[in-house]
Amino acid sequence: XSQLTKDEIEEVREVFDLFDFWDGRDGDVDAAKVGDLLRCLGMNPTEAQVHQHGGTKKMGEKAYKLEEILPIYEEMSSKDTGTAADEFMEAFKTFDREGQGLISSAEIRNVLKMLGERITEDQCNDIFTFCDIREDIDGNIKYEDLMKKVMAGPFPDKSD
């Protein structure tokens, strides 16, 4: 039995209907869009979590009806993912020896590459570019500003 409230179900239905509308109005949402759908509902799943819950990389492999999306949403929302931003902020603070909210650009890059989903040096560069991150005269960055900009998203997808 579902633990979702009527409001939650209605919210999922609205987002589902929007995705269905873009996808041909056939009552289905492609499994490749599951991550995007969850993100529209305020979640921040990793690609790995999306795939664990039935998301696919390629369009056309699988599709879901609303009744099949609800349990995915419910399971994902019940997992307290403790936000990724909190995890990154804690990691950044360990490098902030003087407690001034600043760490070196190199240390930020290391944290970005080690925590969460592994990213490449190029992806780090993209993050710095899209977030308009600039180092101070000592090569340091205000990591709280970086996190605010990253969490605000969205970023251009260069993988297409």
From Swiss-Prot:
CDD domains recorded: EFh (cd00051)
GO cellular component: muscle myosin complex
Domain of life of the native organism: Eukaryota
Keyword Repeat among UniProt keywords: yes
One Pfam family, short name: EF-hand_6
MF-aspect GO terms: calcium ion binding
Job of this protein: In molluscan muscle, calcium regulation is associated with myosin rather than with actin. Muscle myosin contains two types of light chains: the catalytic light chain, essential for ATPase activity, and the regulatory light chain, a calcium-binding protein responsible for Ca(2+) dependent binding and Ca(2+) dependent Mg-ATPase activity.
Protein name per UniProt: Myosin catalytic light chain LC-1, mantle muscle
The organism of origin for this protein: Todarodes pacificus
